[in-house]
């Protein structure tokens, strides 16, 4: 093996960055200071809360107890919200922390729990009416949560939110569902191509790692409006391996492809001369105030 070889893994997010702009992907691997994001912090708090609620030990509670889930969920979310706030404010590059977004986070958590409960095929009920016994049934349906998926070759990886049993109307398992929880804006009709590819990526890794798997499909669960969108289509692993080849480590910066959409959401553009040149030359339209310029102070003359 080449002594200068640097191992790398492709994930759905790094794949998307590479496609949008190879320079963006290259910069993301240079250990530059990351920028905290309020939507990302909220999403992490909701995801981690769902994980904890799925893993609750309810062995010391009565099967018939109700009214326990809303306050338990709130306490768990509040704890993760505080942890995310601390990490957010400790990040050198961060905007204002928005305490008011905890309401949206709470609604997202309720939405996620409602979707999960609906998959149990039990009669629909408010979360306050969910008994301990009912939630144990939900937990028994969850086969895995918040796990890491890695391909056989080790080159592809992803983070699994939930793997659940696909139940029929009688509560019998007929297969598996790979579920990815989404706290962002839901699609109006169909999943966009990148989200569909992400979901199929998880689906295909599970198929590869479990040759004797039952019928399996992938879904995006959108907590904001409690909708479920199924990802259909062929395997994406061959395309992922082709992309992996192009994403090999390079000391030389990869090509920059400035474009309004990809540059607008790039947290590393302050380190990208291509972005600065595109702004200067008019390739990119002037935008609002950009507060992340990175400079080296060479000399300061107070006079």
Regions found by a protein language model. Give the residues of each.
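A non-catalytic, helix-rich entry segment at domain boundaries
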Residues: 52-143
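OB-fold (S1/OB) nucleic-acid-binding surfaces
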Residues: 181, 302-303
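Metal-dependent nuclease catalytic regions and adjoining charged, substrate-binding loops involved
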Residues: 9-10, 189-194, 204-290
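Mg2+/Mn2+-dependent nuclease catalytic core
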Residues: 137-242
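Short amphipathic alpha-helical segments and their helix-coil junctions
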Residues: 5-7, 20-34, 178, 182-184, ...
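Short, charged/polar micro-motifs that form catalytic or ligand-binding hotspots
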Residues: 5-8, 12-13, 32-40, 149, ...
């Amino acid at each position: 093996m080449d002594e200068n070889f640097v191992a790398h893994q492709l994930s759905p997010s790094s794949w998307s960055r590479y496609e949008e702009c190879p320079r963006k992907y290259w910069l993301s691997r240079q250990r530059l200071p990351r920028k905290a994001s309020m939507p990302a912090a909220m999403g992490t708090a909701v995801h981690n809360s769902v994980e904890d609620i799925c893993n609750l030990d309810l062995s010391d509670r009565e099967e018939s107890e109700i009214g326990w889930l809303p306050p338990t969920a709130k306490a768990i979310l509040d704890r993760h919200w505080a942890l995310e706030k601390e990490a957010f404010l400790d990040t050198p590059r961060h905007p204002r922390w928005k305490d008011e977004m905890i309401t949206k986070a709470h609604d997202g958590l309720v939405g996620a729990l409602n979707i999960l409960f609906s998959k149990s095929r039990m009669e629909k009920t408010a979360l306050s009416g969910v008994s301990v016994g009912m939630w144990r049934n939900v937990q028994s349906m969850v086969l895995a949560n918040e796990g890491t998926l890695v391909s056989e070759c080790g080159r592809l990886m992803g983070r699994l939110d939930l793997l659940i049993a696909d139940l029929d109307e009688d509560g019998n398992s007929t297969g598996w569902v790979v579920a990815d929880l989404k706290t962002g804006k839901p699609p109006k009709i169909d999943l966009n191509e990148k989200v569909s590819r992400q979901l199929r990526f998880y689906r295909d890794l599970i198929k590869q790692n479990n040759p004797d798997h039952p019928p399996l499909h992938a879904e995006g669960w959108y907590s904001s409006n409690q909708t479920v969108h199924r990802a259909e289509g062929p395997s994406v692993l061959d395309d992922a391996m082709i992309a992996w080849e192009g994403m090999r480590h390079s000391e030389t910066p990869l090509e920059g492809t400035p474009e309004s959409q990809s540059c607008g959401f790039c947290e590393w553009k302050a380190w990208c001369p291509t972005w600065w040149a595109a702004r200067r030359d008019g390739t990119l339209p002037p935008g609002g105030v950009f507060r992340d310029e990175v400079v080296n102070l060479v000399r300061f003359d107070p006079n």
